[in-house]
Amino acid sequence: MVRDRVIELFRKALAQGADDGRWPAADAGFSVEAPRDPKHGDFAVNAAMVLAKQAGKPPRELAQAIVEAVRAADTAGDLAGLEIAGPGFINVRLSPDLWLRTLARAVAEGPAYGRTAVGQGKKVIVEYVSANPTGPMHVGHGRNAVVGDGVQGLLRWAGFDVSREYYVNDYGAQVQTLARSVHLRYQELHGRAVTMPPKSYPGEYVKDIAAGLKAEYGARFLDAPEAEWLTLFRDHAVQHVLGMIREDLAAVNISFDRWSSEKALYESGTVDRFLRFLEEKDLVYVGKLPPPKSKKGQPPPQAQPDEEGVTAAEDLTLFRSSAYGDEVDRPVKKADGTPTYFCADIAYHWDKRQRADALVDVLGADHGGYVPRLEAAMEALGASRKDLHVVLIQMVSLMRGGESVKMSKRAGTLVSLREVVDEVGRDATRFIFLTRRSDAPLDFDVELAKKQTLDNPVFYVQYGHARLAAIFQKAREAGHAVPEFDLDAARTLGSPEEQDLIRRIAAFPDLLAAAALAYEPHRVAFYLQETIAAFHSWYTQGKKSGEKVIGPDPVKTAARLFLCRALKQVLANGLAVLGVSAPDRMESPETRDIADDV
């Protein structure tokens, strides 16, 4: 990375200055960032401002001394200019040759170009999807799955040791409701008239589960008391639905390293051990929740059960989460002694933290209020809040013909992820889910996703990769060998458009590292769209101006082909990060072979 070269030179200069007694520290944790205005240079370094107090000198005076030391350290001539700006920033301009050499690096590293070691092998567990095993995955789950997979992929490229994890909520009331729904369909299959309650699960898959149980057990549980069949029906239904979920995930090329069961946390004694741990650390006590707040001028409302089924009137075992920044203390054990869902959830995070250095949770935006209590739990358990990062996923609206498709979970009219993938394809599904920030609502236009036009964002990027492949096909037909890097030839890449593409290629590793540390895979999708737009513009302009990639000047042709070679590699790598294919052949928007368009 060109940024790495700047850091290397400044560290070398600072170390030499420290040895000479010109300032007190060799590495003061300075930053190297691209300035907002490119006119100010390629990078801005704040080393003088960071060191000024320790050195006992004004920042601008110290900056001048650092500039002299950096110039002395730059024996290879990689820096074209160093200027002092503002309160003491050092603006850095890189030599044109240093930029050009990044093309050689991109080609030499090939499929590994963009990988960095910023993660230093740190163990991270990324938990995503974790949809309740009560039905097939809908499009909202799909966005969570793709964003989560993008996050874990970025972390791998940045040098983290990543484990992908799915938390299966197979213990609570919802899976019992599923079991009862299956039993009603089981009765129906035996000829009985049944009425499905409002909160039951209405999908056809429930009938399939019931049919499997009927085939295996006949009428054995038709009139049996619930205690005899509830656990069996629950476990059978959960396994059936998990099979559906695995198939849905496979359709978008997503798999997990570990499936963690909530039920297993109880059966293994993990939840009980965790409760004892809380008691030993004096992190819990018996008390009541605060009463519900009344609106101004109105009587206090009646205490209603919360999402855990507990009320302010009961004696509960409360976790001291308010001491760690939460609004109130949270119940971990109900009045009847049974653990709450929150208890099992923080026990799960306690277990995960023992297996990793850091945790990433990818949750629906409706869980935003849940985050402070998780952060409080992490801190109370001796970890840092920074050891947990939560990525929130906003809603998805499915669009068809310019209108929103109405979906209702209760009415059973949710559009499944599988339906969308079957209609628009894996690549379009994955890429479009990443065309907006995860914390912003997304309109998924099904008709647009199917179009083979440049209005379709995934087609636009893949078309660019295929056009680059077609350029090399044409070059071979014209007798041009696949070029190797030649610095003298590369110096002919002087147009503003070519310089822009070179800088975009050079920025790719930094882009991936920054996106990984921010847990934002959409940055890669944005980069690919912007970079391919720059390529299409350069390519089209070259055809109009007579400066084609494959032209009469063999030196310029070799240089432009090498630029295309590096760019093609970056596009392929960027698409790979997002789990999207990079085809070499496609139909052009006008339905002719793309090779005819180069």
Curated annotation (Swiss-Prot):
One of its GO terms (molecular function) is arginine-tRNA ligase activity. Its main location: cytoplasm. One of its GO terms (cellular component) is cytoplasm. SMART domains: Arg_tRNA_synt_N, DALR_1. Keywords: Aminoacyl-tRNA synthetase, ATP-binding, Cytoplasm, Ligase, Nucleotide-binding, Protein biosynthesis. InterPro entries: aa-tRNA-synth_I_CS (IPR001412), Arg-tRNA-ligase (IPR001278), Arg-tRNA-synth_N (IPR005148), Arg-tRNA-synth_N_sf (IPR036695), ArgRS_core (IPR035684), DALR_anticod-bd (IPR008909), Rossmann-like_a/b/a_fold (IPR014729), tRNAsynth_Ia_anticodon-bd (IPR009080). Pfam families: Arg_tRNA_synt_N, DALR_1, tRNA-synt_1d. Residues 288-309 are annotated as: Disordered. It catalyses: tRNA(Arg) + L-arginine + ATP = L-arginyl-tRNA(Arg) + AMP + diphosphate. Belongs to the class-I aminoacyl-tRNA synthetase family. This is Arginine--tRNA ligase. It comes from Anaeromyxobacter dehalogenans (strain 2CP-C). The gene is argS.
